[in-house]
Every structure is written in C-alpha cells, then in structure tokens.
Regions:
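Conserved Walker A/P-loop ATP-binding site and its immediately adjacent core
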Residues: 54-59, 65-88, 174-177, 431-434
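A conserved SF2-helicase RecA2
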Residues: 495-504, 508-579
C-alpha cells in the first residue's frame, strides 16, 4: 500500500474500532496489521520497538470476534499490560475480558499436562480460540523450551485456533527462531518457508548468521536463487559476490510480501541515536587476576572454567571489578551427579515430543523403575543408565544448597558509572544484580531490579525523569517506555543484536523529546568489545532477513579505532600465556 492508502486505512479502521468518546487514532502500521489479521485470520508482525504492539494485541480479539482470547506476555510486563488496557479501553472497543498468561508461568510444571492425574495443560483447559504472542521472540527456542513445546502441541491439536505473533526482534541468528511461529500464524498454503523439516534445515544452513550442529557449517546458498521473484531480485543476485547476503534479501522480500505478514520498513523516530564506546582502565590488581584467568582458566578462588562460554562470562564480570564465588563450594560428590543428570535431561528433552520439563523427565524415569520392579517391562541398557543417573542425583541432591556471592576486586568501573550518573539524568544498565545493588548501597543511586521495581516496590516508570537510575537489563530491557531519558550507560553490553535492539528501544522510541539519544557502553576487556562486534553481526543478519530497520545500523557509531585492543592480560586471547 502507498502512504496515502495507509493513512486512509488508519482513519477507516479507527472509526470502526474506537469508542464514541475515543480521541486516539490508530497508526498506519497498526491499522495494516489489524486489516491483515482480519483478512488472513492470523498475523506475523515484525514490528519495530514502539510501533504500538500492545494496542494491536487487544484489538486482535475485537477484529476476529474472539470468544476466548488469550494474551501471552513476559512476566515483567503483566502490570504494565493491565495499566495500558485501562488507558486504551477509553478510546477503543477492547474485549471485555482477555485472559493473560506469562511465558514464564506457561513453561512451568503447573501449566503442563499430567496424564496420571488426568489434568489438562493450562492451554487445553482455557481452550483459547485466539492466542496473541506479545514479544513473540520469547517463543523462539523450538527444541528445548517447555513453553514452545506446549504451544506447538496446542496448535497441532486445535487447528481452528488463530494466532497473532508480534516482536521487534523476531529472530536472533537463525530462520529456526521463527519458522515454527509462522506455521502457527498462517495457513499452510501461504507459508513462505518449507514445511518439511529436512528442507527447512537446508534453508537454515544457507541463510543463518551462525550454523553449528552435527558438524555442519553454513552451506552455499546458490540453490536459493530460485526464490528470486522478479527482475530486481535477479539483478541483485547477479551483481553481488556475497550470495548469502543476496539470498537473505531475496528471502526477506518473499517473507514481507506474504499475506498475514506485516513488517515496519522505516524508523520515523525524529531523535538521532549515537552509540559510543567508553574505555575504562582498571587497577593493577585486576590485571593480575586477569593474567591468572587467561593462563590457567581459573578464578581467584581456584574454581576452574570448562569452556569458552564460561571464560566469556567471567571475564566480563571481572572487567567490572568482581567475580562470583560458590559459598560454600559444592563438593565433587554433589557436582558430578548434578552435571550428569542435567546433561541427560537436556538430551531427553531435545529428542522427545511429549516431555517438556525436568520434572516430567524425572517422572518418566520413575515410571521405568516402577515397570522394572513389577517386571512389566524389561529395561534396556539406555533405560538402566537413565535410572542410575537419576538415583545418583537424588541421593545427593538435598545435601548441598547452591549459593554464589560476589567478591569485589576493584570498584573503578562502578565509580565511573556513578560519576556519569551524577552529572546528567540517565540510565545505567547492568546485567548482574550485585552491580546494581552496590551502585545503590555505596553510591546512592536508585536500582530497579526484579519486575522493574526498586527496594520500596516503586515501578521504574514512576522514577523522576530529572534523576538518574540503575536498571536491570533482564527486568527492564524490553517492553518499558523509558523515553523520558535520553542518556544511557551500559556496563555489560549484551552480545546479541536482538537483545540490544530491545535495549536501545527503551529510550530511542516514539515520544522521545530530545534531539539526540546517547548510548554509551563500557569497554574494559576484550570480551566487552567482542560483544559489540557480535551484536553488529546479528543486526546485519536481522535486517537482511526481515527488512525491519535495526537501530544499531541506523545509529552513528562513535567507536574509536583500537578501543577493543590494548596491552595487558585484559586484552589477551584466551590461549595466550604472555604479554
């Protein structure tokens, strides 16, 4: 549709959906999403942060005349969602009742099916005729997440149930992040992806940012030239040497042209976005700890690291001046059975269609033991190993209670963050709660942690915009309207383009009054800069695949050359043994 057509559609849909005294108007992208939903019967919305997904979520039930609508949101956004509904129902004809569940609760054992007791799952018990997935990227983990398994089983069993899924970050690095969600939203004849798993896996290997599984890396995307729909696609394919990028662009056009798929293709926010790297130097004591970490893969308390992911995580913590210590340290007699059992559970969930939680795997193994005791079934070697694994874990499980405490080596990074916060109103973003708690206790800053609340239970939205605050990335990094601030300092940049897009969108969004939004991130070790590089690679992939403008690519990057390099152990590679 042209811009004028979209404006006409917004006026028309507003008149049909507003209350007699309503004064709000649908945005063109909201009107288009609701129109596609009504026409196709489902919606796959790749809608940028701040596009108005909440209103679409509520009006979806009105448009489809749903009798039993269900809205699924992250737990931290429940209160905000209820508040928004009270405001929006003054202007639009929202459903009188819309059941709200959270991804967190839906993934718990209580929400699952219990065949022994004849208990239905939470989804089957409510039996919604419409499921709205807000922040739908929470349902992307196809193989392992219990909530995804339960949603998948529900849609297979209830073919007439409709689905509207929306997110500004629908994918992270793979087509597999959203392929299953597409099948819930659209009828089979409209799907822009293969429905056969093996063929979809080949597409994934050709298109994905990173592909690692079964020893197979990315494959040549040449076969996807068949996706070229017109002369423009063909010219793009012929002009570029980067066939993988061309395949992503061609796929993106195929995706966004599919009926029922709506994607924002522009970012009309007036404020510019500037991303800066802030180099932070630490004490000689931290460098000494880093030297030991790099050389021996060992924390100061003697705890050894097993893989590169652990090194990446602990190095980023240490570069902020602390490390996490088991207090007390778990005995090997407890740790090894726990490790073995968790490895077995992960393997079982990955290959099972019926089991979707650790407790269900435990019950399944318990049933094996019962069959063996009554001689109803002879156990094979694999079954016996499962029983032995569980027995070994249950024998020691309650003998130790895990507990970690932060050990501080240096507070230079925190002092710099506090000085920054006291010189301008802004948000200091932290990943680990202990960092936020110390900034609160030692430097006098308000810290909004779990559920976006401070120690007095005040919501982050109610904080004085003239004062700085510290916010948890996990609790407030998505779904919050924080455009009252335009300055950001991130102490621990997420190494994910999807998470960073959400984080940038808290302050760089509609309603921002400042001319510029500044987002600084701390670089005090090599891993901090690697997180930035990975996020950049992710955002290029996301924009190429979905066409949704990514803030990281629209921003001005004031990142000095060499900011991620230096002398000393904080900048060594993990296999280096000398300076």
């Amino acid at each position: 549709m042209s811009a004028s057509d979209l404006e006409w559609l917004a006026d028309e849909m507003t008149q049909r959906l507003k209350t007699p005294r309503g004064t709000m108007r649908l945005r063109p992208i909201q009107a288009l999403a609701l129109y596609e939903l009504a026409t196709v019967g489902g919606l796959f919305g790749i809608l940028r942060v701040g596009a108005g997904k909440t209103l679409i979520s509520f009006l979806a039930a009105t448009v489809l005349k749903s009798q039993r609508p269900l809205l699924i949101v992250p737990a931290k956004l429940v209160d905000k969602t209820k508040y928004d509904k009270e405001l929006l129902e003054q202007h639009f004809r929202l459903p009188h009742f819309m059941r709200i569940m959270t991804y967190d609760w839906l993934g718990r054992e209580q929400a699952g099916e219990d065949e022994e007791r004849g208990k239905k799952s939470a989804l089957d018990e409510w039996a919604p005729d419409l499921v709205v997935l807000d922040e739908a990227h929470r349902a992307k983990n196809y193989r392992e997440a219990a909530v995804v398994r339960r949603l998948r089983r529900f849609f297979r069993a209830h073919q007439n149930a409709r689905c509207a899924a929306m997110s500004g970050t629908m994918t992270k690095r793979s087509i597999m992040d959203f392929a299953h969600i597409l099948t819930w939203c659209l009828p089979a004849q409209l799907l822009p992806i293969p429905t056969h798993w093996n063929e979809l896996e080949l597409w994934s290997q050709a298109l994905d940012e990173k592909k690692s599984g079964f020893g197979i890396g990315n494959i040549d995307p040449g076969a996807l030239e068949t996706l070229c729909a017109d002369a423009e696609d063909a010219r793009l394919w012929e002009r570029t040497d980067d066939k993988r990028h061309a395949a992503r662009v061609v796929f993106r056009r195929r995706l966004v042209d599919t009926p029922g798929v709506v994607a924002t293709v522009e970012s009309p926010i007036d404020a510019s976005l500037i991303i800066r790297a802030r180099r932070v130097e630490l004490s000689a004591e931290v460098d000494a700890v880093f030297a030991h970490l790099r050389q021996f893969w060992e924390l100061p308390d003697g705890w050894t690291l097993s893989d590169g992911l652990e090194m990446f995580r602990h190095a980023r913590d240490l570069a902020l001046g602390f490390y996490l210590k088991w207090e007390p340290r778990p005995p090997i007699e407890w740790l090894q059975p726990r490790k073995n059992w968790h490895a077995f559970v992960r393997s079982k969930l990955k290959h099972s269609r019926k089991l979707d939680s650790e407790l269900q795997v435990r019950k399944w193994v318990g049933a094996l033991k019962k069959h063996a005791a009554t001689k109803e079934r002879k156990l094979d070697t694999e079954d016996l190993q499962a029983v032995e694994c569980l027995d070994a874990w249950l024998a020691v499980r309650d003998t130790f209670k895990p507990n970690t405490v932060p050990v501080w080596v240096d507070s230079s990074a925190l002092a710099i963050a506090a000085e920054w916060a006291h010189t301008r109103p802004g948000i200091v973003w932290v990943e680990n709660p202990c960092v936020g708690q110390r900034l609160r206790d030692e430097f006098g800053l308000s810290y909004y942690g779990e559920q976006g609340r401070d120690e007095t239970e005040r919501f982050i939205d109610a904080h004085d915009p003239k004062k700085s605050l510290v916010a948890s990335i996990a609790s407030s990094g998505e779904g919050r309207n924080l455009q009252a601030w335009c300055n950001n300092l991130c102490l621990d940049l997420p190494p994910s383009g999807a998470r960073l897009e959400q984080l940038l969108g808290r302050t760089h969004r509609d309603g921002q009054q400042a001319d510029e939004v500044e987002f600084e991130f701390v670089v005090s070790c090599r891993e901090h800069f690697e997180a930035y590089q990975q996020a950049m690679a992710d955002t290029r992939y996301i924009e190429a695949m979905t066409g949704s403008p990514q803030k990281m690519l629209l921003a001005t990057h004031a990142v000095a050359h060499g900011v991620g390099e230096g002398r000393g152990p904080r900048w060594w590679s993990n296999d280096r043994r000398e300076q």
